[in-house]
């Protein structure tokens, strides 16, 4: 950072959905390192509470994990209200929860569609809406960062001229990116900013299970010639949540190693 450029979230509460693993955990650690109290929303991971508590102890902030199905409106609303009561006024949200199904399009089912879209689109909307409603009731400003993906713009390859068969994931991320624009437009007058952060290929447990040939092919087509580390996603998220980004809303910011240059 340039001299004098600092970001502090001391005495602020930030929610991270899917904040117990992968990119989400990197977000959780980053906002905690900046002084925020952090609420981690998770679906079913057995170690989520332990992971969240460990972050709190490491950075000396309040942290708490909340089990919640982001596609369930009533549960999301109650969870957001509980976070506000437990950790103090919510100042930011990173809507990061996401899932994928990798299958040829001819084999995909309605259940697959619901599984992906319930989390990646409706779950994002559900969480953003619950937080925004709370802010509107309190006449409070806030910032939302939605984790979309560079896959909102492309069809990922598995090999030269070969498609990675995840059409529901890619289309859900395109929907997610456009959802951000709509929410940003509706809530701007209330001082609520909404932006999308769109990662490229990142080293996570999920990508680690991919075929090495696919990973190598994908990395070879990135101008920076490698997958990112989860921590490399955090700088843009921290900026968007901060007071240094008060004139930024409705944008989609790609952290993709230059992939979309091509």
From Swiss-Prot:
Enzyme class: oxidoreductase
A Pfam entry, by short name: adh_short_C2
Domain of life: Eukaryota
Binding site for NADP(+): 23, 69, 96, 129, 169, 173, 202, 204, 206
Active site feature: 149, 169, 173
CDD domains: MDH-like_SDR_c
E.C. no: 1.1.1.138
Protein known as: NADP-dependent mannitol dehydrogenase
Organism, as annotated: Agaricus bisporus
Annotated gene: mtdH
């Amino acid at each position: 950072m340039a001299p004098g450029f600092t970001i502090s979230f001391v005495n602020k509460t930030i929610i991270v959905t899917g904040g117990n693993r992968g990119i989400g955990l990197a977000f959780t650690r980053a906002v905690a390192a900046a002084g925020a109290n952090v609420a981690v929303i998770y679906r079913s991971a057995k170690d989520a509470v332990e992971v969240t508590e460990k972050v709190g102890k490491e950075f000396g902030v309040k942290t708490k994990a909340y089990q919640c199905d982001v596609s369930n409106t009533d549960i999301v609303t109650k969870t957001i209200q509980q976070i506000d009561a437990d950790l103090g006024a919510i100042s930011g949200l990173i809507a990061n929860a996401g899932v994928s199904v990798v299958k040829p399009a001819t084999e995909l089912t309605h259940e697959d569609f619901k599984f992906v879209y319930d989390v990646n689109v409706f779950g994002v909307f559900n969480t953003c809406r619950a937080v925004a409603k709370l802010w509107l009731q309190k006449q409070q400003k806030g910032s939302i960062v939605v984790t979309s993906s560079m896959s909102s713009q492309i069809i990922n390859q598995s090999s030269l001229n070969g498609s990675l068969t995840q059409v529901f994931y890619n289309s859900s991320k395109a929907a997610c990116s456009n959802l951000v624009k709509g929410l940003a437009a509706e809530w701007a007058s209330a001082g609520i900013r909404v932006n999308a952060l769109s990662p490229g290929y990142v080293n996570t447990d999920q990508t680690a299970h991919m075929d090495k040939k696919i990973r190598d092919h994908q990395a070879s087509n990135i101008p920076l010639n490698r997958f990112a580390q989860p921590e490399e996603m955090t700088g843009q998220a921290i900026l968007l949540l901060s007071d240094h980004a008060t004139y930024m809303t409705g944008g989609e910011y790609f952290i993709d190693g230059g992939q979309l240059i091509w």
